[in-house]
Amino acid sequence: TRRSSDLYQKRNETNELFIPPGARLGDKVLEVSNLRKSYGDRVLIDDLSFSVPKGAIVGIIGPNGAGKSTLFRMMSGQEQPDSGTITLGETVKLASVDQFRDAMDNSKTVWEEVSGGLDIMKIGNTEMPSRAYVGRFNFKGVDQGKRVGELSGGERGRLHLAKLLQVGGNVLLLDEPTNDLDIETLRALENALLEFPGCAMVISHDRWFLD
């Protein structure tokens, strides 16, 4: 029937998400040694050590306030640990996606918000037409002309990913990337991560997604 055909086409259209590949990773990716971080008397992270091998997808779970986002901020250099070390490999380029989606201009169109008005965008180390890049996040045709303020939660989530992934990192730090995403976009993100040639660290309360 026409309805089932339309639904099938819509499902196919939303079953795509593009994570731009970064430069090839070397053998050393990330090593954390004896990390400690506290705020006043409250210790968030105490003597944490781990390493991330090439090609790994690492899930980070824990209750709210446990220091998961703080760990990401230390890894990206936004905060400093009280003690311990975080060592990134020489080939590592981080791409961070935080959980805060308010820093977008509601008066701009989807295309303007991602492209800055440029017809050609630098995506990692390559260039591509901006409308093609935005389209890889399931904003097709007229959807690219939607105002940011009119978007649903799931659409804002896709827009957020499109903005922050364009740096073309080879190690992704994804903080609650599944918030507000619909089931088809969740599956598309899962597939994109599995196909991503670099590493990813994912903070999520969504155990189904992490599994």
Residue ranges of predicted features:
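Short secondary-structure junctions and interdomain/linker hinges
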Residues: 6-7, 121
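ABC ATP-binding cassette signature C-motif
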Residues: 22-211
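Short, small-residue-biased leader/transition segments that mark boundaries at the very start
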Residues: 1-4
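ABC-family P-loop ATPase nucleotide-binding domain
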Residues: 7-31
